[in-house]
Amino acid sequence: MKIEVSTEIKNACPQFAGIAIAAKVKNTPYCEALWQKIDEFTVRYREMYTTDSIKDIVTIRATREAYKKCGKDPSRYRPSGEALCRRILRGIPLYQIDTLVDLINLVSIRFGYSIGGFDADKFEGDTLTLGIGKADEPYEGIGRGMLNIEGMPVYRDAIGGVGTPTSDNERTKLGLDTTRLFTIINGYSGKEGLREAADYMVELIKEFASAEDVELIEFE
């Protein structure tokens, strides 16, 4: 799978960089060892941050700024990385979905990135292009119904949108039958920190999802 960044994104967010991770995986409904790791990190996170101070985390702040430059209100349509962090800081447990989604969420809260997670077999075509959502562009967010993505960064495959920082699309979402994972770490703050987050993602998918044939794709 190739990833291209449109001119409109490069103009709005010139520092943007990303890393995609592709791998063969085995998903499971729940992993106790992973959730022990998540719970331990959540305790530490609540000691380090408040709902006010997370605005100063570089990755979260940069994603919010990217929304504003593209034409979206990040307080009304929160990027997922920020939304997950706010959730745990309000004392609400993270959603327990399945092992792949849960470990992606752990990487997201640890580093502050909004991360897309996809079933690669559900993509149409061989290229994803990162652009900006248009008025009335159809997009069904996972568990959200039709989502207004106008002015929002969006990855599109051959037939339409598959992922935004706020929500991925129902059409390409991960499931228990997923065997080919494709995940994208979105660095609106630039390259710094991306590789560390990607390496942690690889560590988790190898430990908890039996990942094989892991490939990292850097793009900007």
Language-model region placement:
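Charge-biased, low-complexity intrinsically disordered regions
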Residues: 1-220
